[in-house]
Structures are given as C-alpha cells and as structure tokens.
Design a protein with these regions (language model features):
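Condensing-enzyme catalytic core mediating Claisen C-C bond formation in acyl metabolism
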Residues: 1-60, 168-256, 351, 362-379
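Short beta-strand segments
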Residues: 9, 90, 120, 145-151, ...
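Short acidic, glycine/serine/threonine-rich loops at helix termini
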Residues: 17, 98-100, 131, 156-161, ...
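Acidic-glycine-rich active-site phosphate/pyrophosphate-binding loop
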Residues: 37-41, 96-110, 152-163, 229-238, ...
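Claisen-condensing/thiolase-fold acyl-transfer catalytic domains that form or cleave C-C bonds
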Residues: 63-67, 93-95, 107, 112, ...
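Short glycine-rich phosphate-binding loop at a beta-alpha junction
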Residues: 82-90, 277-286
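Flexible, glycine-rich active-site loops centered on histidine and acidic residues
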Residues: 138-180
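Non-heme di-metal
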Residues: 382-603
Length: 603
C-alpha cells in the first residue's frame, strides 16, 4: 500500500520579529553584542516567531502550537480530528517531562480514541513522526494519520535564564532558535480535489555509535554524562540550573560533522538508486544556519552529485529555525504556495546534531488521476570511473572531517577556545611538513613519463607555486612572538614524519597518479578549512592580517588548485585502477594528516 501527504499545515505564533527587535523580547544578552552580530550574520535568519510577549511572558504552550498546525492541515483537507486514526508528534522538549507530548496534543485536539506516538530527539524527530504515520497507513492500520513537529524554545532563551557562566555553547543558540509547528495529513489515497505528495520512501539513520553528544540538555558537559551526573541527580532543579544543566547546548567543536554525515548518507542513497540527482525537481534542506549551506554545496559538487541551487527551497531567513517543525514549515510554504506540479520529484533532507542523525524523504507530486503511478525510478546507468572516483573521494573527505573533529587543537579552534600558544604550535608543526611539499611534488613530476607530459607540467607548475610557502609560516610565527631560529631548526612530529615518508615513497614510483588523492586532502584543507579557521583564529586572538598570511593565502590559492585538480579527476586519464589507487592514497593521507595535527598536543 502507498501513503500520500494530502495536506500540510503550519502555525507560527505572534508577529515576525526582526533582528533589530530581538533584545526587546529576550532582554540584553550577558555576552557582547559582537557575538550576537556575528551569529546573526552567520545564520542568515532575518525574521522569526516567539510564543512570548515583550515582557518575556510565554503566551502559548508547545502543545497548543502543535494543535493549531494539525487543525490547519485537517481543515485544508476537509477533515476533523474525529477522522484521525493515529497522531505522531516530534519535539525537542515538551511542556512537561511526563506524559508524552503526543498524549498532551491529543488531549487538546480531541477527536476520540486514537493511536499516539511521541518521537523524541531534535530536528529529525519530525521526520520520525512522519515515518510512523506513513507506516501506519502503509500497513493498513489506519486510513488517516497525522504527523506534527513542534518547538517552543523561546522561554529558555530569556536573559534571566542565563548567567555570565552560561558559556558560548549555550549562548549562541539564543540567536539561532525560534518557535513554530508544522503538520501533515497522511492518507491511503490522494485527495480527490487537488494535489497530493506520494511518499516514495523515507530514510532515517543515527550515527551515534561514531560520535559523542553534540546538542543536549540535562548535563554540565557532554563528556560528564554518567550515573549520578545528570540534572535529575541534583537535590533540586535550582541546583541543576545553577550548574547550567538546564540550558540547551551545542558543542560547536564537533558540529561540522553534521554536514559530512549528511552528504555521506546522500551519496549512499544515490548509489542505491533511490536518489537520482538529475531527476530531483525540488530539494528542501533543513539547516540551522546559512553557514552550512555552502559546505553542503561544496561537498555535493565535489562528489559530482550536485542538485542545482535553483531547485533548492528554504524559508530559514523568514521563518527561522524551528527544529523538528522546520521541514514541515518549509513544506507547507512550498506546497500550499503552488511550487509543485504533478510529476515533480521532491527530496527532503533533515540533519540533526543531537548525536548525529540524518533523514531523507522522497516525494512525488500527484493529482488524483495519476496517484497510482509507479514509484520513483532508480538509476540504471552504469557508473563511470570518474563518477565513482568523485563519490568515493567525497566519502573519504566526510570521514576525514570526522577524524578532524576529534583532534584536540581543531576542536579548540572550532569551539572558539584556541590560545595564542595553540596557534603558534600549529604554525610550528605545519611548517616542518609544508617545507617538503614542493619537493615531493617535484619528485612526482620527475617520475611522470613522457606519455603524460601535460600532467607532468601541471605537477611542475604546482611545485613552483608552493616551494616558498613555508616562508609565510616563518613570518607568521615571528609576527606572533615566536623565535625564527626555533621554527627554522624545528623537527617534524611523528605524524609529520609518517606523512612525509609516505608522500616521498609514492612520489618515487612511475606515474604516481595516486598522489592526486593526497592533493585532494591537502588542498581540500586549504579550500574548505583555511578560510574558516583564519576567521575564527583572528577573532579569538585579535590578530592582524600580517599574522595569518599562510592560512589566508591558502584559503584562496587552494581553491584555484582544487579546480585544476578536479579537471584532471574528470579527464580521460581516470581508469578504475587509477581511481582506486587515488582513493587509497587519499584515505592514507587523511589519516596521517590528522595524526600530524593530533601530535601537536603530544609535543
């Protein structure tokens, strides 16, 4: 049996609140206005909604927001709560710890006895609710089911809930989150009087076995979660609050993993034939900040699986980040706004940072007359060697991002806690390996046979461009108070020794095309990380431009280098054997580069 979304409803409380009006609702923040400006610029949110007045009084319950979204969807479909056989809800935090959120929404909604399910979690809990509703219809248990995602977070964002010790991991969320609810009606047949969305398939997977907790409440810090350490173990809620346990927090040091696992799952769905990028007409992606959009675009593009941005739809800027409700709030505007036409294929993507989950839903827009057409087609074409290579390299990069997130110095940079000593140590250790970069590229060029003269010329040009890069590191080191003699006579750490030895070994072979995998990792660090790191380091340490020249230069130069590299990776040079060797070398270099950075804290 097939399930169809036959109506979508949303509810956003109060009037839209602009950035200039935020403090009149949340009150003055305990941290600097500089942080607020930086977060608002990064997240791209211009308007949001709060179930709260200007005096800080909560005006509605979370269950009320959910009820209004459900009623909006049912009314649009011409149904009432008495027609509903199952109600599934998703939210981060209900109004009460007990009972379940779905029971509270049902109590307010009415409609007689029905099956209820409360999905816990963060952003993916809305999709979890949808999957439950879909399953209940597919299995023939219910004719009509409703799924709703709802969030009421504003009451936890008021300044009087925060102290100077709240910490950046809690404070920055004040400018990211807002209130709202979205709901969908799921039925066994398309609606007879308009368009419906056939649910072709849905996919939700957790990667919690690979990652620590990222977004949480109820503990002082994620690493301290153990028996006797949670908020329920304190003598009173006041004591838990005093320790900051009741704040919603997000570990920004590992947050970027969310992009990597999302793209990793996306590539898997493409390879299984469930997603065919060229056949997707609309992509609705939930992301908490515009900052992540460019990262998603870069990884999809590098994998050769990009869905053109003109097919993307988001209302983050105008509706805010409403967590579990966001994907439904987005779908409501697109569906009810006439964005879809019969035959259109829609892909929903929802990553969740709680402990790293990601979900996808594939929909097809149908009219009643064609609602019984077959499921979405899979990919039948054989995968070319270059296509396979680009997808494999994207997976290597995604796993490399995970490795980097566990490196202490990277976590400190990403979380805003790096010190000048950290930056000095980073420069010192990079310099010893960077100095040899041009040498191994030159050796590789000398071992490229005359049959590949154009590629040899590319290697030689690249070596010439990088032969004096280490001098920029020397100057940066001195500019932040380091001794030139110390950095010029420094030794490679064990990770750098292993990396250099591997690179020279590979470069000494005939036609060492596998080193394109090494370049993919090393140049990718410059293109994807250097610019971000230099911005964070400059802000954290209040450095001038002449103190961050190396990272600044490589943020731009490596982008140009990667463009040339991708031309080669897409060329006729690539056979399956060469592609496999490139992927193998990329994996090795990724691990050794991470080891090089890990060893900074062991020096």
């Amino acid at each position: 049996m097939t399930a169809y979304i036959t109506a979508v409803g949303a509810y956003l409380p109060g009037e839209p609140i602009g950035n200039d009006d935020l403090e009149s609702y949340l009150a003055s923040p305990p941290t600097s206005s500089r942080l607020r400006r930086r977060m608002l610029e990064a997240n791209g949110i211009e308007k949001r909604h709060y179930a709260m007045d200007r005096q800080g009084n909560t005006t509605m319950l979370n269950e009320e927001l959910a009820e209004k979204a459900v009623r909006a969807a049912l009314t649009d479909r011409g149904l009432t709560s008495r027609d509903v056989g199952m109600l599934a809800t998703g939210t981060t935090q209900g109004d009460l710890p007990v009972p379940g959120f779905a029971a509270m929404v049902h109590g307010r909604l009415g409609g007689g006895p029905m099956e209820v399910l409360s999905a816990g979690g963060v952003c993916c809990s809305g999709v979890a609710a949808l999957r439950a509703a879909e399953a209940s219809v597919n299995l023939g248990r219910h004719r009509v089911a409703v799924a709703v995602g709802s969030e009421l977070v504003s009451r936890t964002l008021r300044a009087d809930r925060f102290s100077d010790r709240a910490g950046f991991d809690a404070e920055f969320l004040r400018w990211m989150l807002s209130d709202g609810a979205g709901a969908v009606v799921v039925e066994e047949r398309p609606r007879p009087d308009g368009l419906s969305l056939r649910i072709d398939w849905s996919h939700l997977v957790s990667h919690a076995d690979r990652f620590p907790v990222c977004m949480y409440a109820g503990a002082s810090e994620p690493g301290s979660i153990a028996a006797g350490s949670t908020w329920q173990d304190r003598r009173s809620p006041a004591e838990a609050h005093a320790e900051g346990m009741l704040h919603l927090r997000q570990d920004v040091g590992i947050l970027n993993n969310i992009v990597a696992i999302g793209v990793e799952e996306y590539i898997g769905l493409v390879r299984s034939g469930q997603v065919v990028p060229d056949r997707i007409d609309h992509l609705l992606v939930h992301y908490s900040s515009e900052h992540f959009r460019s990262d998603i675009v870069d990884l999809m593009t590098e994998a050769g699986l990009m869905i053109p941005e003109e097919k993307w739809f988001t209302n983050l800027a105008t509706k805010g980040n409403t967590g579990a409700a966001s994907i439904f709030v987005m779908l409501e505007e697109a569906f009810n706004g006439g964005r879809f036409a019969p035959g259109d294929r829609i892909l929903l993507m929802v990553p969740e940072s709680g402990r790293f989950s990601v979900s996808f839903v594939h929909l097809t827009c149908v009219a009643e007359s064609d609602g019984k057409t077959g499921l979405a087609e899979g990919a039948n074409e054989d995968e070319g060697d270059s296509e396979w290579l680009l997808q494999e390299l994207a997976l290597v990069w995604a796993r490399f991002e995970t490795q980097l997130s566990r490196v202490p110095i990277v976590r400190r940079i990403e979380s805003g806690t790096a010190t000048l000593d950290d930056y000095r140590a980073l420069i010192y250790n990079l310099r010893q390996q960077v100095k040899e970069g041009a040498r191994w590229i030159t050796r590789a060029a000398s071992n490229v046979t005359s049959d590949y003269a154009d590629l040899r010329a590319e290697f030689i040009e690249h070596a010439a461009e990088e032969q004096l890069d280490f001098r920029m590191l020397d100057e940066d080191y001195v500019a932040i108070g380091g001794d030139r003699g110390v950095i010029e006579t420094g030794l490679k750490n064990p990770g750098s020794e292993a990396l250099s030895a591997f690179m020279f070994n590979q470069a000494s072979r005939e036609n060492p095309f596998d080193l394109l995998g090494a370049m993919y990792i090393i140049e990718g660090l410059g293109a994807n990380k250097a610019t971000r790191w230099v911005e964070m380091i400059r802000e954290q340490l209040e450095l001038d431009e002449d103190q961050v020249r190396f990272l600044t230069y490589h943020g731009g130069a490596d982008t140009e280098h990667t463009e040339k590299m991708f031309q080669i990776l897409r060329s006729d040079l690539i056979t399956r054997d060469i592609a496999e060797s490139i992927v193998h070398t990329a994996r090795v270099v990724a691990r050794l580069y991470a080891l090089q950075l890990e060893e900074i804290d062991n020096g």
